[in-house]
Every structure is written in structure tokens, then in C-alpha cells.
């Protein structure tokens, strides 16, 4: 169509993305499909077309009237990753490392892992280099991440450990030491 200019975002293209998502949502709600898989979307174009949500994930959550925690879950073979933050500028990430957000991510990892038949081994990544070096290079690990892990383990008995330095955590995870990385 004339409305499409290769390499440029537009409201027309965003409306096409939204129409595809809406069709998939309708089919899922009608029980005609059991899941939705889609390729890359352009959030900017979708916003030009009138989407008022931060991401397609929030769009889905609203469409399905979801009240429980949700986020993008990525799978690679037997390894799952769950995000504590998502689709935010790096300058906002530290402020989003809260007990509530971290608990939601851990809970989602546990529930999703269990639904796949696992008793998941969950590893929580640090935010700062070298796990913050005991507060010398960032306090998120000391003030939020470690205490939250300890509370969750005490309250639930789930197999959650960390924080681990993010630069080396995936070596262990890909070797099979963990099922979920938060």
C-alpha cells in the first residue's frame, strides 16, 4: 500500500500491528487458539495508531483483564528468563528494583516453572558490577535484592538464590545449574 514507507514507522503500520494483536486476542478468548506467537512489533507505530499502553505486554494484560503479575518470559531450551524491569530507560532501572517488583518476577518464574513441570531453581541476577561489592558499587543488592530473596525463601520455601553477578550468571545457567534467571 501507498501508506507504507519502508523503514519508517507510521500510524498505518501501527494500526496493522494492533489489528493483528486484536484478532489473536479474539481467537484466544473464543477458545479457537491456545497461545499467541508474534514477531517484532513497533511500539512507536502502535502508539501513533492510538495504543495508550507502555508495551504489547500491558496491552495483552488489559485485554485479558489480568490482575496477577505479568512480564515477558523468554525461553531458550531449558532456561527461562523473567524480568524485574521491562521497557524502561536505563536511567529508571535502579528505581524499579523494589521488593514488590522483584517478588513479582520471582513469583512469575516459580509459577511458570511449575506449570512446565519443574520445581524451578531460580537465580536472581545482581544489578551492579560484582554484585555491588557489598555496597561500594551500588546498594541495590544490599538494600533490596538480598533481603527480598531471603524473605521469599523464608516465606515460601522456593529454591531462590542470589544475587549473582550478571556477567557470569548465564555461564552457570546455560550449563544447567538453574531453570530460571530473574
Q: What label would you give each PLM region?
A:
Residues 1-56, 100-181:
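Contiguous, glycine/small-aliphatic-enriched amphipathic segments in soluble metabolic enzymes
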Residues 1-6, 80-89:
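Short, basic/glycine-rich phosphate-binding loops at helix/coil junctions
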Residues 46-52, 76, 80, 89, ...:
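Helix-enriched interaction subdomains in cytosolic or periplasmic regions
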Residues 48-76:
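Short, acidic/small-residue loops that bind anionic groups at enzyme active sites
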Residues 58-62, 66-68, 88-112:
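Active-site glycine-rich loop that binds ribose-phosphate moieties when present
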Residues 70-72, 81, 181:
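Conserved beta-strand scaffold positions in the cores of enzyme catalytic domains, especially
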Residues 74-82, 86, 122-126:
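Mobile beta-alpha loop/short-helix "lid" or hinge segments that flank ligand
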